[in-house]
Amino acid sequence: MILSIGEILADMIGEKIDGVTTFKAFCGGAPFNLAVNAKQSGAKVGFVGRVGNDVIGRFVTAEAQKANLDYLDIQTDDERNTTI
């Protein structure tokens, strides 16, 4: 099993339409991206990371669960915000 440990964050991609900028959030972070790509290549993969107790943290945790990794441990930190 490949175990990737590190950051999981939200990548915010902006788009300007009719003078209004909107943003879409995507789950990212190099260690998490590595885990997802390895899983898609057929490897058995786990990921361990930490997010803040905030809306972005809940978003990336929900997105990470959709990746169907073999092991997932995302801890919540009440004292820090999730990185964007």
Outline where the language-model segments fall.
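N-terminal glycine-/serine-/threonine-rich phosphate-binding loop
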Residues: 1, 24, 36
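Conserved donor sugar-nucleotide recognition element shared by glycan-biosynthetic enzymes
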Residues: 27-31, 56
